[in-house]
A protein has these predicted regions:
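Structured alpha/beta reader/binder surfaces that contact nucleic acids or chromatin modification marks
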Residues: 3-124
Length: 124
C-alpha cells in the first residue's frame, strides 16, 4: 500500500505525550472540515463536501453513511504530528492503526470533551 500521510498540528502538551508514548490516539471534532478531510465518496450518489455540511452535529447519520459504505475513509497510512507552524517546528510521524468515532479517554484530552463524540485517530 502506498504511504499516505495525514498532517495534524497539536499543542506542546499533547505532542510531548505522543513522543513519550503516553498518548496513542488523537481527537478531531466531527465537523464538516474533518468529514471532508478524512472521508471520500464511495458512490456517485453522495458528495462528501455537501454531506459534510448537512451532517454537522449528527453523528448518528454520519455513522449510517459509514456503515452503509456510502462514504469511506481516505487511505491514510501515517499521521504526522507537528507542534507549531514554523518550518523547523518539532514533528513526529506515527503509523495509523484506525480511525473511528467515539468518546475520548480521560487524561488524553481536555476534561470538557469527555462526554462528546469525536473522530479518534489511533496510532502505533
Amino acid at each position: 500500500m502506498k504511504k499516505k500521510v495525514l498532517t495534524l498540528t497539536v499543542s506542546k502538551q499533547w505532542f510531548d505525550m505522543i513522543v513519550a508514548g503516553e498518548k496513542k490516539e488523537e481527537y478531531r471534532e466531527i465537523k464538516p472540515y474533518w468529514v471532508a478531510r478524512l472521508f471520500q465518496n464511495n458512490s456517485n450518489i453522495v458528495d462528501v463536501q455537501s454531506l459534510a455540511s448537512c451532517l454537522a452535529g449528527r453523528t448518528d447519520l454520519l455513522k449510517g453513511y459509514i456503515d452503509a459504505n456510502r462514504i469511506v475513509l481516505k487511505p491514510y497510512t501515517h499521521v504526522l504530528f507537528i507542534n507549531g507552524y514554523r518550518k523547523d517546528c518539532p514533528r513526529i510521524e506515527k503509523e495509523i492503526d484506525s480511525i473511528t468515532i467515539g468518546k475520548p479517554k480521560k487524561g488524553l484530552c481536555p476534561d470538557k470533551w469527555l462526554d462528546t463524540e469525536f473522530f479518534i485517530i489511533k496510532f502505533k
